[in-house]
Amino acid sequence: MAAAALTSQLNALVNNMFAMGLLDDQFQQLQMLQDSTAPDFVSEVVTLFCDDGERIICELSRQLEKPNVDFDRVDSYVHQLKGSSASVGAQKVKNTCIQFREFCQQRSRDGCLKTLDLVRTEFYDLRNKFQAMLQLEQQIQACYPKH
């Protein structure tokens, strides 16, 4: 497929992610930091976010399965996820983390479990779209041979 068609697909995907509220302006700020000196900057940051997010969500599940939940520890993990979400512009995940932290402060296991399900769904939805975005970027780069 031609680079122009792939670029069009990529732009449509990213625009859709903004329209769905998955991303906010912070993602555009990230994109502006990418240039010829750091051509893989966005993909590196997004990959790190996806890896960290998956690790944190697994840890949150483990913590909330314990008979005596350490809500301060859970809150610390949610705070990490909120921070990394904010840094990549993952608006829905970040906003759900804000709700999650409120349940941690209330010491509500049920609230935390329900919000964990929501944050998991939103995170994996975003991760899948990020993976599609990165694949399109790789296909576009493959259209231009390196000298």
From Swiss-Prot:
InterPro entries given in the database record: AHP1-5/YPD1, HPT_dom_sf, Sig_transdc_His_kin_Hpt_dom
Result of knocking out the encoding gene: Dwarf, wide leaf and small grain phenotypes.
Keywords carried by this UniProt record: Cytokinin signaling pathway, Cytoplasm, Nucleus, Phosphoprotein, Sensory transduction, Two-component regulatory system
Broad class of the protein's primary localization: cytoplasm
Subcellular location: Cytoplasm, Cytosol; Nucleus
Tissue note: Widely expressed.
GO molecular function, one term: histidine phosphotransfer kinase activity
Modified residues (Phosphohistidine): 79
Any one Gene Ontology BP term: phosphorelay signal transduction system
Modified how: Two-component system major event consists of a His-to-Asp phosphorelay between a sensor histidine kinase (HK) and a response regulator (RR). In plants, the His-to-Asp phosphorelay involves an additional intermediate named Histidine-containing phosphotransfer protein (HPt). This multistep phosphorelay consists of a His-Asp-His-Asp sequential transfer of a phosphate group between first a His and an Asp of the HK protein, followed by the transfer to a conserved His of the HPt protein and finally the transfer to an Asp in the receiver domain of the RR protein.
One Pfam family here: Hpt
Domain HPt: 38-133
A Gene Ontology term for the protein's cellular component: cytoplasm
PANTHER family: HISTIDINE-CONTAINING PHOSPHOTRANSFER PROTEIN 1, PHOSPHORELAY INTERMEDIATE PROTEIN YPD1
Miscellaneous comment in the UniProt entry for this protein: Plant silencing simultaneously OHP1 and OHP2 exhibit phenotypes for a deficiency in cytokinin signaling, including dwarfism with reduced internode lengths, enhanced lateral root growth, early leaf senescence, and reduced tiller numbers and fertility.
Role summary: Functions as a two-component phosphorelay mediators between cytokinin sensor histidine kinases and response regulators (B-type ARRs). Plays an important role in propagating cytokinin signal transduction through the multistep His-to-Asp phosphorelay. Functions as a positive regulator of the cytokinin signaling pathway. May play a regulatory role in salt and drought tolerance during plant development.
Comment on protein domains: Histidine-containing phosphotransfer domain (HPt) contains an active histidine that mediates the phosphotransfer.
UniProt protein name: Histidine-containing phosphotransfer protein 1
Protein's organism: Oryza sativa subsp. japonica
